[in-house]
Amino acid sequence: MSAPAQPAPGVDGGDPSQARIRVPAGTTAATAVGEAGLPRRGTPDAIVVVRDADGNLRDLSWVPDVDTDITPVAANTDDGRSVIRHSTAHVLAQAVQELFPQAKLGIGPPITDGFYYDFDVPEPFTPEDLAALEKRMRQIVKEGQLFDRRVYESTEQARAELANEPYKLELVDDKSGDAEIMEVGGDELTAYDNLNPRTRERVWGDLCRGPHIPTTKHIPAFKLTRSSAAYWRGDQKNASLQRIYGTAWESQEALDRHLEFIEEAQRRDHRKLGVELDLFSFPDEIGSGLAVFHPKGGIVRRELEDYSRRKHTEAGYQFVNSPHITKAQLFHTSGHLDWYADGMFPPMHIDAEYNADGSLRKPGQDYYLKPMNCPMHCLIFRARGRSYRELPLRLFEFGTVYRYEKSGVVHGLTRVRGLTMDDAHIFCTRDQMRDELRSLLRFVLDLLADYGLTDFYLELSTKDPEKFVGAEEVWEEATTVLAEVGAESGLELVPDPGGAAFYGPKISVQVKDALGRTWQMSTIQLDFNFPERFGLEYTAADGTRHRPVMIHRALFGSIERFFGILTEHYAGAFPAWLAPVQVVGIPVADEHVAYLEEVATQLKSHGVRAEVDASDDRMAKKIVHHTNHKVPFMVLAGDRDVAAGAVSFRFGDRTQINGVARDDAVAAIVAWIADRENAVPTAELVKVAGRE
């Protein structure tokens, strides 16, 4: 008989995610977890899998060959939730094949906050289908089917078993390392069978590397959320499948909190608000991922850009412009066509000349839409001789670039094909490099805070060993400098191994929005390679020639993406200084329109965007309409207001300030906007002369 499982030497119990347990050879991990007194079902911290000494996640049914230290993984951890979600995806696939026997299986990985599974079915799934599937899934969960790992004896055995599953067959030999391919990638080719808990007969199974929870009863709470079309493996050249999304959590309470979060996120969805607030659209006639901004959206965008221009001018940047297309040779020089061609639109072959008989007189050449501005900024630097006295040279451009994003990943304004980058490139000496990076990071953080984003951490992206240009020692120096500057900022610095672009390591500023979601925002990239590739030089004080250091920086990332993020951060209620309509006058009756027009004219003289609603709607309906359209200041006037030369403020939270002298009201609004207050104005926050 095996000795009882014990905590590993030097480590006591406590938090299961921090404990280590020794599993005797020939004993299941589940037995060791149970003997250690850790919960195995029914609580949010129940142990669902374990991590072995090599860091691999293992089923609780795993039996090591030798005494082994393991770390229990609880349901309420990231890894625990991921396993629960993957197991729930299997339950979904089982339900689909029971209710839709003709369905062929794609892939079904866990994803952030949920899971999905792709199916080849004749017709799209309907909401009624999802309800029926969820009902069957609950029955499967209640049955307590066992997840049983089975090793295929050979790939031939796997192919024979999967003969009627064409997509699974394709995965048997997959070597892509794609994180979303859960079917293969382990040391062995395995399947997970769902077994009847009483008879242990196989009910259903799937090609899968695992791990999984012990039984379907270990799925505490789940919900199917939606379905959509999706290309097999994300490639539009492949078959179009139907994808069902869902979510699963360690408790019903956690699921309920998540569903509330999803509801709020949907309310803030910039794609929805873009239509409701008449900000932007994506006409089919133009194409996927190509936005047009409407007048109201254009105002917000102009304000974003104008404030940025002002701050860049104050910081010593010089403004440049570059064309949208260029000869292919430029991107051969930069390396983009070697390392980034898949992200570029196809070339335009032009400039060929022909004789009258149709024979070629002058060959044409390829032109590309630019995916980045940096090569052109290198040419601007190289356009004339440069002295050390000019450095640091800070070039800035709102440059529109084009990237061939797959249609399946295009998403509103946050993932587009045509985007305008607030692109800066700084050329400096190596002696100036650290100070320039420090001031640049401070500039980025301060400017983001001016737009109301203040919760940051940093991510350091380092070299991809398979995809980089330049010498190893140059990369090491650049990475070390960025790490030092990031650490000096006092912000958390998270490593991102292999995440750098091909030409240099980078620091990215990660921002949390009002819902606590993280967005990659600004990037600061140190580059010793482009100056070498483009032959950039400056003359030092002693007359010798040197290569400058180049720093790439995009503060917003892109105007479009930043616009989308801000829209969701503020739920469409932009700060008054950004709002397309800052003030609307609402008359009690028609006879008060002329008075409010005078107030609006007074506001406009101070640069305030003011309108008067002279429609036939009743005042109450006008208030509801402009509240829904997120106008920060509503100014009301009736007989008493006109007689007293006053107005009343009405705010979106339904608070009100009555009888404010007209000049005082104008002064309060002008001051609020001039101060660039990012809060939503309320009766409590707005300061009016003579009122405490």
UniProtKB/Swiss-Prot annotation:
Region feature (Disordered): 1-20
GO MF annotation list: ATP binding; metal ion binding; threonine-tRNA ligase activity; tRNA binding
Cofactor-binding details, from the entry: Binds 1 zinc ion per subunit.
Enzyme class per UniProt: ligase
SUPFAM superfamilies attached to this UniProt entry: Class II aaRS ABD-related (SSF52954), Class II aaRS and biotin synthetases (SSF55681), ThrRS/AlaRS common domain (SSF55186)
Cofactor(s) demanded: Zn(2+)
N-acetylserine: modified positions: S2
Keywords noted in UniProt: Acetylation, Aminoacyl-tRNA synthetase, ATP-binding, Cytoplasm, Ligase, Metal-binding, Nucleotide-binding, Protein biosynthesis, RNA-binding, tRNA-binding, Zinc
GO biological process: threonyl-tRNA aminoacylation
Region ranges (Catalytic): 269-575
Pfam family name, one: tRNA_SAD
PROSITE patterns cross-referenced by the UniProt entry: AA_TRNA_LIGASE_II, TGS
Gene Ontology annotations for the cellular component aspect, listed alphabetically: cytoplasm; plasma membrane
Main location per the UniProt record: cytoplasm
Catalytic reaction(s) noted: tRNA(Thr) + L-threonine + ATP = L-threonyl-tRNA(Thr) + AMP + diphosphate + H(+)
The protein's Enzyme Commission number: 6.1.1.3
Domain TGS residues, every copy: 1-74
Highest taxon listed in the record's lineage: Bacteria
Annotated localization: Cytoplasm
InterPro entries cross-referenced by the UniProt entry: aa-tRNA-synt_IIb, aa-tRNA-synth_II, aa-tRNA-synth_II/BPL/LPL, Anticodon-bd, Anticodon-bd_dom_sf, TGS, Thr-tRNA-ligase_IIa, Thr/Ala-tRNA-synth_IIc_edit
Listed HAMAP family: Thr_tRNA_synth
Protein's job: Catalyzes the attachment of threonine to tRNA(Thr) in a two-step reaction: L-threonine is first activated by ATP to form Thr-AMP and then transferred to the acceptor end of tRNA(Thr). Also edits incorrectly charged L-seryl-tRNA(Thr).
Subunit structure, interactors included: Homodimer.
UniProt family annotation: Belongs to the class-II aminoacyl-tRNA synthetase family.
Protein name: Threonine--tRNA ligase
Gene transcribed to yield this protein: thrS
